[in-house]
Amino acid sequence: MKIRHRLAGVGLMVSILGCTFPAWAGEWIQGENGQWVYEENQELLKGWNRIDGIWYCLDTETGVWIEKPSMTSEAACRLLENKLLEMGMYRDEEEPLQFKVDYENTQMIQVSVGYEDKPDVFHRINTYEIDKRKGTADPVVGEKEFSLR
C-alpha cells in the first residue's frame, strides 16, 4: 500500500514537472551598435509599450528604443503620464487616469488628465500645454513648466 502511494506521488510530480513550460520574462538587450531593444517571449516589442509601468517608444520596424521620440499627440500623452508618475502626482485617484488630447496645432498639444466614473463622463483634474519643439509641459493649474524628455 505504501509503495502505491509513493508511486502515485512520484507519478504526480513527474506529470506536473513534465507539463511545465519555461516562462520568458522580458529583458532589455543592448546590441553591438549600443542601441537598446526589448525582447519578450523571444520577440522584439515595437511601437509604444508599457514596460514595468513606464511607457517606452520602440521603433515600429526595428524595435530600437527611441529615447526622444517626435512629439506627436500619442507621445505627448505617454511622456506626460511617465513624468507625472515620476513626480508622484495623481497616485491616490480612485479611478484609472486617462489622458485626452483636447487640441493640437503646429506648436503645441493640449492634454487633459482626468478619469471617467461613468461612460462618457470625463472629470478633468488638470490640463497641460505641451510645447512640441521644447518637449515641455505647462500645467494650467499648478507648478511651472517641466520637461517631458
Give a label for each model feature.
Residues 2-74:
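Extracellular adhesion/carbohydrate-binding repeat motifs centered on closely spaced tryptophans
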Residues 51, 69-77, 104-106, 121-123:
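Solvent-exposed, acidic/flexible segments
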Residues 36-42, 49, 85-94, 117-121:
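Short, solvent-exposed secondary-structure boundary motifs
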Residues 124-149:
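A short, surface-exposed interaction/processing loop segment used at functional sites
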Residues 68-100:
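Short, non-transmembrane alpha-helical segments in secretory-pathway proteins
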Residues 65-67, 118-120, 146-149:
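A short local loop/turn or secondary-structure capping micro-motif enriched for an aromatic residue
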Residues 92-132:
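Exposed beta-strand-loop-beta-strand "reactive/processing" segments of non-cytosolic proteins
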